[in-house]
Amino acid sequence: MSRYDLVERLNGTFRQIEQHLAALTDNLQQHSLLIARVFSLPQVTKEAEHAPLDTIEVTQHLGKEAETLALRHYRHLFIQQQSENRSSKAAVRLPGVLCYQVDNAIQLDLENQIQRINQLKTTFEQMVTVESGLPSAARFEWVHRHLPGLITLNAYRTLTLINNPATIRFGWANKHIIKNLSRDEVLSQLKKSLASPRSVPPWTREQWQFKLEREYQDIAALPQQARLKIKRPVKVQPIARIWYKGQQKQVQHACPTPIIALINTDNGAGVPDIGGLENYDADNIQHRFKPQAQPLRLIIPRLHLYVAD
């Protein structure tokens, strides 16, 4: 497929996402809102977009106000829709839930509508990340050439739909991206970097090359069977824990956008019990279970690369 055809499909798919989101938000407003609870988080400024989040203050919104914020959030796809001071790199998050009363016919209609939106979002992400054939660093410029100001993460994010929950509880999750590597794999990566000299602020080209050479020497000095691990922290995320009484099971969802809960009165479902979301404080995290960590030694800080001792 030609690059021109891909761009045509990209734009066409995105227009469909916008149209279907507009139709969904209009549709939801026609149905009976049983309960709504969303939690706005402080906006991340451009100056603080790379800073670690040690505390997050939560503001709760209820009822129609919560619904208005949620429906607007689903359609928040461009930086032009937000403050100039707000970071375009930091994710815009609005955890919470909207609960609507439905019968069998309405439930099926909304399920199909949301499934279609999620299919379009997945297709759009596939075009950008796979079909474009571009490395991650080049995708941003390519997408924004055709869709200026697009917040790609918001365009990718699918909607979460649940049916007849008994309870909904919100919380915070701290995660790491973990990848195991061999010594030779790391050396291969560093070789590629050494073969393409460049400057990386605040270092000059020569300083950066020297830094890479030192890193290469440090890794080469390790035994070939050394166990290396990238353990990169991900910014804390809001989550929702859903309890289904009939199935006697709990399901956990990432919750960057409000969940849509359908309460089917044809099946005798009742209004769920919905909890709040506490402020986040990194110094007061309580772990239900924290396994004994493997002893690790940091060897290349910029890569979050550790070696197992």
UniProtKB/Swiss-Prot annotation:
Q: Example GO biological process term?
A: DNA replication termination
- On whether ATP-binding is a keyword of this UniProt record, the answer is no
Q: Which Pfam families match?
A: Ter (PF05472)
Its function? Trans-acting protein required for termination of DNA replication. Binds to DNA replication terminator sequences (terA to terF) to prevent the passage of replication forks. The termination efficiency will be affected by the affinity of this protein for the terminator sequence.
| Classification via InterPro entries | DNA_replication_term_site-bd, Tus_dom1, Tus_sf
Protein's recorded name: DNA replication terminus site-binding protein
Its gene is tus
Is the keyword DNA-binding in the record? yes
Q: Which keywords are on file for this protein?
A: Cytoplasm, DNA replication, DNA-binding
Q: Which GO terms describe its cellular component?
A: cytoplasm
- Extract the HAMAP family matched here: Rep_term_Tus
Classify the source by domain of life. Answer: Bacteria
Mind telling me which Gene3D superfamilies this protein's record contains?
A: 3.30.54.10, Replication terminator Tus, domain 1 superfamily/Replication terminator Tus
